[in-house]
Amino acid sequence: MTAGRLLHLLRAPTGTPSAGPVPASAACRGPPHRQLLRFRHGPAGMRRVPVSCTSTTSERKEGMTYKDAGVDIDAGTELVRRIAKMAPGIGGFGGLFPWGDEYLVAGTDGVGTKLKLAFETGIHDTIGVDLVAMSVNDIVTSGAKPLFFLDYYATSKLDVDLAEKVIKGIVDGCTQANCVLLGGETAEMPDFYAEGEYDLSGFAVGAVKKDKVIDGKNIVKGDVLIGLPSSGVHSNGFSLARRVLEKSGLSLSDQLPRNDGITTTVGEALMAPTVIYVKQVLEIISKGGVKGLAHITGGGFTDNIPRVFPSGLGAKIFSDSWEVPPVFKWLQQARINDLLETLMM
């Protein structure tokens, strides 16, 4: 497993062979620098939960946080808490609407300040994949199959060639998610955005039978936690990543070694498109036993994993259970204190 993942929980059948998934509390192979990460869903919190890390290495030194980069996750959580008073149905990864014997499951998202790196690197053909991924990965956590997607593209002055590249990426993302690009909105707003820049939002709708909804309520002690690998940073934490880049003195064109021995540039590593997990997750669901799914995005492990737990349950994860991609190692050199909460770790 690698850092950054969509996590799902399976009930471990009696006599599960050791070659298969192991309980998160079991010993895992890896380097001696082990951290035991504990995540718990308490009765009071919808997202924020206590976290403890026990490490055999020295205590963490003071370092950079997401808030230092201008993003206050606590403020976002407080806004969700307030909105919940007006719209009690929110709080899941996707919103469920009853429709006959099914639920329509909807989600909306953007790609944040990853757009800034797209402008700086000139990589625009995959940002649309990121946009689709952020919404469809949310709705598949309920077991829903994505049906269609809509996009919103806004800019000060429409560059047709640039917009075509972006929308081609959206079409590619929809193909990966096996859904239809049903429509969208192109908004040209003079003087609102900087020249050559644009903003994106996406909206996905899927469906799942009411008796097939995955909501985590049947998770029990002893269930197994499984992670699916990411391609890198995906589409969260880029305000912090850009701050690290600024302070490191590196440029987006500098070389960054990969685990497979091949080198890539820092810009290419950061711009790697978000994995669309729809097909592999639906295939796993079809085999039975999946009780809960979490899409690890903003808030990282600490906020997203407990969202699928019944009150009072938690998870133990050994941090040496996966191979960390080089881009995370590079970011960690900046002594990011809240990596688990910011960058899908």
Segments (PLM) and residue ranges:
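Helix-biased detector of long, well-ordered alpha-helical tracts
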Residues: 2-345
